Swiss-Prot record:
Annotated protein name in UniProt: Probable F-box protein At1g30780
Lineage start: Eukaryota, Viridiplantae, Streptophyta, Embryophyta, Tracheophyta
Pfam family, one: FBA_3
F-box domain segment(s): 230-280
PROSITE patterns: FBOX (PS50181)
Superkingdom of this protein's organism: Eukaryota
SMART domains noted in UniProt: FBOX
Organism this protein belongs to: Arabidopsis thaliana (Mouse-ear cress)
Length: 482
């Protein structure tokens, strides 16, 4: 009786529960499914536009019924970085008799192997240069297990940036797997770097951007985010280091040897010493300064004194003639034009009856001597030819014929007027007490140079001096020279 009473009570309770709960129809289940999907999109992307990806699955946000039936907006004029997705067909809204409002249509997307999802491409947004719309609060491309994802691989070639997309296996990137050596699922799209504005920094927490040789790929989060503007000098090629160091001065190279052992070995190597010597020999070590000669003349008619300045910037250029009137009321130097061939002054000027005369010669062959005449009043220059046999240079050359017998022979050399002084490039060299060939009497030379009774004067000219970093084996001489 007790067991029968318990069974009857259970049957009565179950019957009462079944009678009180309404039966769920197919329409109610479908309505609940649609409401759940819409709530997911509204919670995750409250402010997103149309066709914004949800959970990297490709589900778009749900527009209103008027937006669904409205014609799509025209495509932008600029090309998209990634190929656009095909138009998604929308099913007509089903008729639900127990619904007050029609429910939103459910989009039908293509299968995943044929068209992989693009979690970072916004098809409705205007062209932004680089594909993704970045989320400032989280990863725009998270590594979620069991969800296939797309990873870009950027390749540089000239001024073009090639963007290729690779589909991962649905797991996070581990180690140094770059996805850059796998076959492409989509056709690459060349982008001109001059017109595309790339983001200065990728906002990724787990995936960072790294430069490896000629490719820019996405690496793992264990790599350091370095500044691309900083260049490691040790990573430069050896030949490039040699070129940079050869353009420094010898004093700077001496200090740079203390930077590292590698730099010290490079600077001290014979190959670098030869390269530095070759580079230094090509540079001019003898600067050219303009030679200025000034003459003062007097004009008895106008009772004025004027100064003539002749500047010789180079032998291959015309001379610069300037005139200054002394006491002329603040007038400065004035240029005067000389149409004749340039003649360089070689003698001291003499002022006679309103004219200034000085000896000169032509700097170009045949280098004829002339007498320059400057009219102080009219400020004009004229030339008077001089006889060629007036200016002659020569010297005696002693030649040692026999070393054992100490026999010498003498030769007298006479230069014609076409031969001028001893030249060092474009610079003339002469010394007091010597003739035009640089040879003179020892007593006269010592008297003009200040050596009257004691000592000798030795003049050493090294016009071909070239700076070098070669060192002597003697450490004392090395310290003195360096």
């Amino acid at each position: 009786m007790a067991s029968l009473s318990l069974v009857l009570r259970y049957v009565v309770f179950l019957s009462f529960f079944i009678l009180q709960k309404p039966k769920e129809t197919f329409s109610s289940r479908l309505q609940r499914s649609h409401a759940k999907v819409a709530q997911i999109g509204a919670d995750d992307y409250p402010s997103s536009g149309r066709n914004t990806p949800v959970h990297d699955l490709g589900f778009p946000d749900f527009p209103s019924f008027q937006e669904a039936v409205a014609p799509p907006p025209p495509p932008p004029d600029l090309p998209l970085l990634a190929p656009p997705l095909p138009d998604v067909p929308l099913l007509p809204p089903p008729a639900f008799p127990d619904f007050e409002k029609p429910r939103l249509p459910v989009p039908v997307w293509p299968s995943l192997p044929e068209y992989p999802p693009f979690p970072f491409v916004d098809q409705s947004a205007p062209y932004q240069g680089f594909a993704p719309r970045f989320d400032e609060s989280a990863n725009w491309m998270p590594s979620t297990p069991s969800i296939p994802q797309v990873f870009p691989c950027l390749r540089f070639k000239s001024n073009l940036l090639r963007v290729e997309f690779w589909v991962s296996s649905g797991t996070a990137v581990k180690g140094k797997d770059r996805f850059c050596n796998r076959p492409s699922k989509l056709d690459p799209n060349p982008v001109d770097l001059k017109t595309v504005r790339l983001p200065s920094k990728f906002r990724l927490k787990k995936l960072l951007c790294r430069v490896e040789s000629s490719e820019v790929c996405f690496g793992d989060g264990n790599e350091k985010d370095t500044n691309p503007s900083e260049i490691d000098l040790d990573s430069l090629p050896f030949d490039l280091k040699m070129v940079i160091l050869t353009r420094l001065s010898a004093k700077s190279l001496t200090n740079f040897k203390r930077v590292s052992k590698m730099w010290s070995s490079i600077i001290g190597s014979q190959r670098f010493i030869d390269s530095f010597f070759t580079m230094s020999s090509k540079q001019s070590r003898c600067p050219k300064f303009p030679v200025n000669t000034r003459f003062v003349g007097y004009d008895p008619i106008d009772d004025q004194q004027k100064a003539l300045s002749v500047s010789v910037p180079s032998r291959k250029r015309n001379l610069e003639h300037k005139v200054l009137t002394l006491g002329g009321g603040g007038q400065g130097w004035r240029h005067i034009e000389v149409t004749n061939a340039p003649f360089s002054p070689v003698t001291v000027g003499v002022s006679i009856d309103g004219f200034v005369y000085y000896g000169a010669y032509s700097p170009t062959p045949p280098m004829n001597p002339v007498l320059v005449c400057f009219d102080v009043r009219s400020e004009k220059i004229s030339f008077i030819k001089a006889p060629n046999d007036v200016l002659q240079w020569g010297f005696d050359l002693w030649i040692l014929e026999d070393v054992e017998r100490h026999e010498w022979s003498k030769q007298t050399c006479v230069f014609p007027s076409s031969v001028a002084w001893d030249y060092v490039g474009d610079i003339q060299m002469s010394f007091p007490g010597t003739n035009k060939a640089g040879i003179g009497d020892d007593e006269e030379f010592r008297r003009c140079s200040g050596f009257v009774d004691e000592g000798e004067c030795h003049v050493r000219i090294a016009p071909q001096h070239v700076e070098s970093i070669a060192r002597f084996k003697d450490p004392i001489m090395s310290r003195i020279l360096m």
